[in-house]
Amino acid sequence: MSLNHQEPAATFDDDTSHQHFKIYKPYGFLSQFVPETRKRKKLLGELFHFPDKTMAIGRLDHDSEGLLLLTTDGMMSHLIRSKSIEKEYYVQVDGDISDTAITALQQGVEIGINGEKYQTLPCKALRLADEPSLPARGRKIRDPRHGPTSWISITLCEGKNRQIRKMTAAVGFATLRLVRVRIGNIAIDAMQPGEVQPQTNFNAALIG
């Protein structure tokens, strides 16, 4: 795990009493500090000695990885979560995804949320010409002899529970790997799984 300090960015406000971080949440970790059950799970506190009252802004599920923002500032967390900020994901799906499926994702598909039907909002979706340069995942995803896979980019301004996995399943292509690479103007860049980078603030994510 490496710790990289970035140059200060333009400030969202003058409050310097809070601390902010961006991290690469590894596969297999929960986006929280306190377990919800007695079952042993990997938690964010194992990655870094975060200050008290640090909270994740949004979540990535256990099987997903990539960019996650953390802060001790509840107001900033609320502001970011309340805005329609783009979140971009690189998604590896099972099979050779079709143009028809890409178009359906762009237009919105019907998925299930808490037992109710939900129509996803229109989003940006495109097929990536080449496999993205991402850190290798520790656990093998699938034997390549089982057929082709495709990489796509999906950019949303909403975030329902396991939404992208449900969206790709709705168009006939199961998600094999899901990596969040951008939130607003904050990108994961060349971070590695488990890496933590302190930030001045997250005002860049609020632009636009």
Annotate the PLM regions.
Residues 2-208:
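RNA pseudouridine synthases
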